[in-house]
Swiss-Prot record:
4'-phosphopantetheine is transferred from CoA to a specific serine of apo-ACP by AcpS. This modification is essential for activity because fatty acids are bound in thioester linkage to the sulfhydryl of the prosthetic group. It comes from Alcaligenes faecalis. The keyword Magnesium does not apply. Belongs to the acyl carrier protein (ACP) family. The keyword Ribosomal protein does not apply. This is Acyl carrier protein. The gene is acpP. GO terms for biological process: fatty acid biosynthetic process. It comes from the Bacteria. Pathway: Lipid metabolism; fatty acid biosynthesis. Carrier of the growing fatty acid chain in fatty acid biosynthesis. InterPro entries: PP-bd_ACP (IPR009081). It is found in: Cytoplasm.
Length: 25
C-alpha cells in the first residue's frame, strides 16, 4: 500500500511531466 506522500509525489511528477511536454511542444 502506497503512503499518501508517495501518491502525492507520483501525481506531482505526472503533472510536471505534462507541463514540460506542453512547454516543449
Amino acid at each position: 500500500m502506497e503512503s499518501i506522500e508517495q501518491r502525492v509525489k507520483k501525481i506531482v511528477a505526472e503533472q510536471l511531466g505534462v507541463a514540460e511536454a506542453e512547454i516543449k511542444a
